[in-house]
């Protein structure tokens, strides 16, 4: 692997947490948001990693809770003219790329992603230019500019299948930006994969030793791990997968106790899927006192009720997502390739069932 970016030496400035709201204030903002959604002909889409009360509000108002791609696809089929995207900035960009005719609003445009931040377009373009014989595959957690530089965009749910497909064609791969997911995909497929060295600040904190100690306390529990986690943690898992795949695994695994190594925001939908099971947070490196993310993305936490109400009410430069037309056209090519591949994959799976 070619180390261009050492996430261990990169300390991202975390945003301030939203100010705590009283019960009355929360009720006020929930009511205000519902009114604004109706007035603006808007629908709310929220990521699995946002706070539970935000996910609940999205569902209550006819929106959806999903991963970044499904959020954008939901918006493209919904009649609303405005999408309120509760997530991080690249998710708003993806929604705009797939829905250029719609207004895309976010609670804040300052909600970042360490994978996006860790893959700046200028450095990444130089890296790609240095390896012109390789097919460029980038994760959805990237900027519109990085997507436009890529041949393919991919989500974790179909990453293994896509790399297997490209490998069968004899193609060598550049993978960006997550080194752990890239390592996992390479190990699963045996493909020639050159990885950019980014990492998710949440999943990178899960460590084997702490997880082993927790397993001793809960010997009958199954371990569920997102592949953005370090390889040693992934190797301990009973199930490895994307957010939606982990929720499905929680439903189907026979164990009644589940240790979950991903952002704790997923517990809202996971508990809905298996209310009879006990969900346990996998320990992060610091096990509380010294952890940085503590298993919850600090930028996802910026999507509070007050910020959502402000985004719907104010709009404008502080809340609306714009993507340059040429950049959008460039990013749409690898995104559509992924969507077409995913559709054909579902057809093949259905045909083999």
Swiss-Prot record:
Cofactor notes: Binds 1 [4Fe-4S] cluster per subunit.
EC number, UniProt record: 2.5.1.72
Binding site for [4Fe-4S] cluster: 113, 200, 297
A GO term from the CC aspect: cytosol
Record carries keyword Protein transport: no
InterPro entries: NadA (IPR003473), NadA_sf (IPR036094), Quinolinate_synth_A_type1 (IPR023513)
Pathway field: Cofactor biosynthesis; NAD(+) biosynthesis; quinolinate from iminoaspartate: step 1/1
Biological process annotations from GO: 'de novo' NAD biosynthetic process from L-aspartate
Cofactor: [4Fe-4S] cluster
Residues noted as binding iminosuccinate in the record, renumbered to the chain: 47, 68, 139-141, 156, 226-228, 243
Reactions performed catalytically: iminosuccinate + dihydroxyacetone phosphate = quinolinate + phosphate + 2 H2O + H(+)
Compartments reported by the entry: Cytoplasm
Key words, A-Z: 4Fe-4S, Cytoplasm, Iron, Iron-sulfur, Metal-binding, Pyridine nucleotide biosynthesis, Transferase
One GO MF term: metal ion binding
Transcription regulation keyword on record: no
Main location group: cytoplasm
Root EC class: transferase
Pfam hit, one: NadA
Function: Catalyzes the condensation of iminoaspartate with dihydroxyacetone phosphate to form quinolinate.
Family statement drawn from the similarity comment of this UniProt entry: Belongs to the quinolinate synthase family. Type 1 subfamily.
Name of the featured protein: Quinolinate synthase
Species in which this protein is naturally found: Pectobacterium atrosepticum (strain SCRI 1043 / ATCC BAA-672) (Erwinia carotovora subsp. atroseptica)
């Amino acid at each position: 692997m070619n180390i261009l970016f050492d996430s261990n030496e990169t300390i991202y400035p975390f945003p301030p947490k939203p100010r705590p709201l009283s019960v009355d204030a929360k009720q006020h903002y929930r009511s205000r948001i519902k009114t604004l959604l109706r007035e603006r002909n808007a629908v709310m889409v929220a990521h699995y990693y946002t706070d539970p009360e935000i996910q609940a509000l999205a569902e209550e108002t006819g929106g959806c809770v999903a991963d970044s791609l499904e959020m954008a696809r939901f918006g493209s089929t919904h009649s609303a003219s405005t999408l309120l995207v509760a997530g991080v900035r690249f998710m708003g960009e993806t929604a705009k790329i797939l829905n250029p005719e719609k207004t895309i609003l976010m609670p804040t445009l300052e909600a970042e992603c360490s994978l996006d931040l860790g893959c700046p377009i200028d450095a990444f373009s130089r890296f790609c230019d240095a390896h012109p014989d390789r097919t460029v595959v980038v994760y959805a957690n990237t900027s519109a500019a990085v997507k436009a530089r890529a041949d393919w965009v991919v989500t974790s749910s179909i990453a293994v299948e896509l790399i297997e497909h490209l490998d069968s064609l004899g193609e060598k791969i550049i993978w960006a930006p997550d080194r752990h997911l890239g390592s996992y995909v390479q190990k699963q497929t045996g493909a020639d994969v050159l990885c950019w060295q980014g990492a998710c600040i949440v999943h990178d904190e899960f460590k084997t030793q702490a997880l082993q100690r927790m397993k001793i306390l809960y010997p009958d529990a199954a371990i569920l791990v997102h592949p953005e986690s370090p390889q040693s943690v992934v190797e301990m898992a009973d199930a490895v997968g994307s957010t939606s795949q982990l929720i499905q695994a929680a439903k189907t695994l026979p164990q009644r106790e589940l240790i979950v190594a991903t952002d704790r925001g997923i517990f809202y939908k996971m508990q809905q899927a298996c209310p009879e099971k006990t969900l346990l947070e996998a320990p992060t490196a610091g096990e509380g006192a010294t952890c940085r993310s503590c298993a919850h993305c600090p930028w996802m936490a910026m999507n509070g009720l007050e910020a959502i109400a402000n985004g719907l009410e104010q709009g404008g430069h502080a809340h609306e997502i714009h993507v340059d037309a040429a950049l959008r056209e460039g990013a749409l090519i690898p995104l559509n390739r992924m969507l077409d591949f995913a559709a054909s994959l579902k057809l093949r799976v259905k045909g083999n069932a």
